[in-house]
């Protein structure tokens, strides 16, 4: 077998394994989902004559980490570690006036997760609160269950 053919086959085998998810590995659910969630969140706020939220990459990263922690089982589903996330946000947003957080698991589209939150009194209150910024993060576990975190900051 020629050296070129051997290298070519090795590359193909390596590439083949790289295309399959490894059990336990968390993946971002899909591109554009954060923007879709933002769109429906702001559409809901607009329907109540509230200003649109501004999505920030630094807040997205904080939200993504929490979704990933839930997907990997490093924390239970919910608001574990909220105080630490709030402390991180306080370092980024100054002056800091307040923060709220919504989490969810199950829906597969931005519209579905926002509808779920709209129909829950506490989540709805967060979405309609006096906030200026948002951070959104998603992660899927090895079984494909999607975890969502949206934080709201003033």
Where are these regions (language model features)?
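Bacterial N-terminal signal peptides
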Residues: 10-18
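Functional surface patches built around histidine and acidic residues
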Residues: 19-154
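Bacterial N-terminal signal peptides that target proteins for export
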Residues: 2-11
């Amino acid at each position: 077998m020629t050296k070129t053919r051997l290298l070519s086959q090795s590359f193909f085998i390596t590439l083949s394994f790289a295309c399959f998810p490894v059990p336990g590995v968390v993946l971002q659910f899909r591109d554009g989902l954060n923007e879709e969630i933002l769109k429906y969140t702001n559409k809901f706020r607009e329907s109540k004559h509230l200003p649109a939220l501004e999505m920030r990459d630094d807040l997205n990263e904080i939200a993504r980490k929490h979704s990933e922690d839930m997907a990997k089982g490093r924390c239970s589903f919910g608001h574990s570690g909220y105080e630490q996330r709030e402390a991180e946000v306080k370092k980024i947003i100054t002056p800091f006036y307040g923060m709220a957080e919504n989490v969810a698991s199950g829906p597969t589209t931005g519209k579905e997760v926002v509808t779920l939150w709209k129909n829950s009194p506490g989540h709805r209150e967060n979405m309609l609160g006096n906030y200026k910024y948002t951070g959104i993060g998603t992660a899927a576990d090895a079984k494909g269950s999607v975890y969502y975190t949206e934080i709201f900051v003033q």
